[in-house]
């Protein structure tokens, strides 16, 4: 409110350097946007610049690029870039590869010390989870990505905190402790809200299911944890799968880690099946489509079983309640809790 954006872009064709740029006017004071000084560090001819969600979308002579502030480590960037290099040598995937600046660096700094990255981007729409064909196209690409990631040998230098994550059994154990803590808080309240009464009414059923899933997954990880660990995307959902005319792009690898690839498949399948009222036909089609590219072993299917068994949506609702304003819970959250009980 009270902010007006003015876009003025000029070029030096000989050097492909952005000269002047976007102005942000606040209270009559003009502040030059940082993206101009950052883009001038790249061998790119800028044709157009527009704001995206938390980033700048840049039309260039080398295609669409995305400019975003970066707050991670250089080691993390190097890890992702090395993986992209190996993927491209074997597969030529549609991914959001980082662009190096004139100095050959992945990171560029603005005068105020902020650090920025530029990467390849796609103007195509996100995967529509309500469209079976798009869902199965996405599954094909997920399987292809997983197959190629399995060929990449994990390097000792990649042993970073963001790459070595909790196994799902340990994560379930932590979530169960959070469920117990929230239930104890609710039971000790004298006057309970409708949401809290709903939790008291169905907690035992969901918690027993959570315990069974945790026990099964812990045993699974104890026997198969090491042998089932490969590089995973880490955040696969419809927002990170873009439907290009000739292929399917997978973007935002900032949570890529060493773990169980079935977690990637589970998260995407769950999102899709929720949109289709848990259609068994669609679920089987997704598994068959994945298996045509990367056959699912009995071990993979066991892992998927325990992931689906865990009442993740229930935990999310309870955890949201416990960490938010407990005095007021939106009616929609109460409906979600009741819907979860009906789906059992």
Short names for language-model regions:
Residues 4, 26-45, 205-208, 334-344:
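Regulatory N- and C-terminal appendages and interdomain linkers associated
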Residues 37-59:
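ATP-binding glycine-rich phosphate-binding loop
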Residues 57, 98, 214-263:
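Active-site acidic catalytic loop and adjacent metal/ATP-binding pocket
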Residues 116-129, 181-188, 310-326:
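A glycine-centered beta->alpha junction motif in the catalytic cores
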Residues 262-295, 308-326:
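Active-site activation/catalytic loop segments of kinase-like enzymes and analogous catalytic loops
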Residues 315-344:
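ATP/Mg2+ or Mg2+-diphosphate-binding catalytic cores
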């Amino acid at each position: 409110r009270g902010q007006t954006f003015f876009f003025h872009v000029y070029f030096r064709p000989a050097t492909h350097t952005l000269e002047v740029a976007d102005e942000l006017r606040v209270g009559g004071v003009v502040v030059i946007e940082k993206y101009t000084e950052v883009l001038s560090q790249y061998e790119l001819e800028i044709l157009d610049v527009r704001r995206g969600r938390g980033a700048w979308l840049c039309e260039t002579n080398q295609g669409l690029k995305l400019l975003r502030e970066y707050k991670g480590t250089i080691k993390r960037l190097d890890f992702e870039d090395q993986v992209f290099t190996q993927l491209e040598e074997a597969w030529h995937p549609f991914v959001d590869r980082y662009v190096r600046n004139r100095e050959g660096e992945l990171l560029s700094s603005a005068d105020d010390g902020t650090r920025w990255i530029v990467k390849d981007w796609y103007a195509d729409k996100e995967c529509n989870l309500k469209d079976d064909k798009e869902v199965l196209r996405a599954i094909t690409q997920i399987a292809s990505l997983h197959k190629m990631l399995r060929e990449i040998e994990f390097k000792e230098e990649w042993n970073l905190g963001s790459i070595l994550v909790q196994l799902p059994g340990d994560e379930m154990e932590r979530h169960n402790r959070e469920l117990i803590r929230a239930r104890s808080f609710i039971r000790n309240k004298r006057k309970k809200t409708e949401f809290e009464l709903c939790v008291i009414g169905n907690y035992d059923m969901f918690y027993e299911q959570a315990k069974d899933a945790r026990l099964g997954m812990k045993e699974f990880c104890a026997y198969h944890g090491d042998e089932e660990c490969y590089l995973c995307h880490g955040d696969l959902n419809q927002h990170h799968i873009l439907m290009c005319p000739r292929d399917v792009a997978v973007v935002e690898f900032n949570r890529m880690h060493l773990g169980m690839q079935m977690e990637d498949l589970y998260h995407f399948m769950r999102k899709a099946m929720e949109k289709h009222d848990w259609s068994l036909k669609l679920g089987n089609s997704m598994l068959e489509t994945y298996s045509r590219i990367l056959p699912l072993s009995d071990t993979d299917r066991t892992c998927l079983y325990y992931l689906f068994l865990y009442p993740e949506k229930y935990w999310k609702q309870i955890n949201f309640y416990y960490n938010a304003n407990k005095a007021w819970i939106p009616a929609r959250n109460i409906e979600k809790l009741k819907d979860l009980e009906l789906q059992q």
